[in-house]
Amino acid sequence: VYFVLGIILIWVSINVTNCTDGVDGLSGSLCCVVISAFTVIFANELGYYVIADFIFVATLLAYLYFNSNPSSMLMGDAGSRALGFYIAIIAMKTVHPISYILLAIVLIIDGGLGLVKIFLKRFLKISILVNTRTPLHDHARKNKGWSDTQVVFRFIIMQIVAAMIGYIIISLL
C-alpha cells in the first residue's frame, strides 16, 4: 500500500510543480518555501537530507536571482519536475508523508486544480470551474488583472502562511 501511495505522491508532486511553472519565479519560490518548511519541521527525521535541502534552497535562491521578472534564465520542465520529485521524496522520508498536503497546499491548489478539472471533464464528463482558468496563477493574471510580480508575491505569502499553519498542525500530532 505504501508503495502505491508513494507512486501517487511522486506523480502528483511532479505534475503540480510542473503546472505551477508558468510565471517567472513562481515555481522556484514556492518550492523554496516548501523545502525550507520540511527542513525546519523535520530536521531530526531527515538526517543527511537536511544538507541536500540546504543545497537545493541555495541553488533555488541563486536561480531566482536570474529568474525574477523579466527572467534571463528559465527552469523548464526538467527543473520543475526535478523539484516536484525531490519534494515528494523528502515528504516520504518524514514520518508524516501526509504533511505534503499541509506544506505544499499552494502548489497543490495552483497546479492540481487544472489536473482535477481535466480528469473530471475527460473521464467523467463533468465540467466544473468553467469560468476559472487553470492553472490558478493564469486566472489571477488574465482574469483578475494581477501582474506577474503580484502573482509571485501573493502566492509566496499564501505558501508561507500555509507552511506556518502546517507547522502548528504537525507539531500537535
Task: Report each predicted region and the residues it spans.
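Alpha-helical transmembrane segments
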Residues: F3-G6, I10-L173
